[in-house]
Amino acid sequence: MLYLFYYCLLSPPYYFFTSHIQDFDYENKDQEELSFVSQGNRLSGTLLTPQHKTPSAVIVVIHGDGPQDRYSNGGYNPLFNTFLDANIAIFSWDKAGIGDSQGNWLHQSMEARAEEAVAALKLMQLRYPEVQVGFLGFSQAGWVIPIAASQSQPAFSVIIGGAVNWREQGQYYQKLRYEQQGKTPDEIIQLLAKEQKENDDIFGLHGTKDRTRRNDMSEDRFNFVVKNYLSDSSSYLRKMNGRILAVWGNNDLNVNAQLNACRYRAILNTHHQADIVVFPHASHGLLRVPEFNYQLESDWPIYRQLQFLWAGRKAYTEGSLPLIIDWIKNKNPDFSPYNMDCNL
């Protein structure tokens, strides 16, 4: 991994020897290349398992937005190694059209992505009939997993940083973007209202779907938004099978954590196997705040990227991953310190 070489080259000896750089390699882990077919596309991935052990659980990873390969360009490695060290296997694949997978992820609706997820789940369930197999995903996976889990029988689903409504999530994201740009509250209100109307006129239920009005988007991206602009997970959340853990970071810059946690709680209030958790001092991806709290991968300065390489799994907010692991393993962790007060 070239970035590891440069990191070692540039780092003083103290930082190198105190780092968690080993979290980015899969030494002493078994790796098996696997492929499966969904909607006519052959999708390629890797099954990662603890060496010489039968896993206690298998996670089927559902990516967020963007052209992600099976390891999210190496960003998933510390997370995956943490699960593997806890005897939890990982199956992750390149999104359609990325790496060795056929197709084009920008041609997919959330329903199409869910169909893909179900195919992967069934593949793992056939391989491990005596082991609990479930979903885990970030961000956009919050629209994919509820559909998939309502159309299959996962043992569990872990949704991290999910939003219920696509349209509202876009407004929240853009609001924070404008705040970072230094715009005034009045300017932001006006800009958001204008953008909402324009987007509804184009992408809404009765929208024009006129691409000439959004020349800032590629044709593929435009059509992707057309397919998914009205996505709302409410009805699917109610029909999900298996245990549910919905998790947010309280300092999420992409999704309104408080609003969506309370919506999940209201929707799943009759689901006795649902846990709703908001971790303090945590980002959209449960990374530590303020060090690793950015909206986009492209926002990360070089020194933060190097710091992430040094931190490895320690980049995640303290206690978050052990609690998720204990939950997956049915150890009934105490989430009470992380419950949202939705009565405020």
PLM segments and residue spans:
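N-terminal cap/lid segment of alpha/beta-hydrolase-fold proteins
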Residues: S19-H52
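Short beta-strand element of the alpha/beta-hydrolase
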Residues: P55-G64
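The serine-hydrolase catalytic nucleophile loop
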Residues: D69-L79, K95, Q258
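Conserved alpha/beta-hydrolase
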Residues: F80-D100
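Alpha/beta-hydrolase active-site loop
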Residues: H107-R127
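Accessory cap/linker subdomain of secreted extracellular hydrolases
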Residues: I160-K239
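Short beta-strand/loop motif that positions the catalytic acidic residue
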Residues: M240, A246-W248
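Short alpha-helix in the alpha/beta-hydrolase fold that links the catalytic acid
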Residues: G242, L253-I267, E291
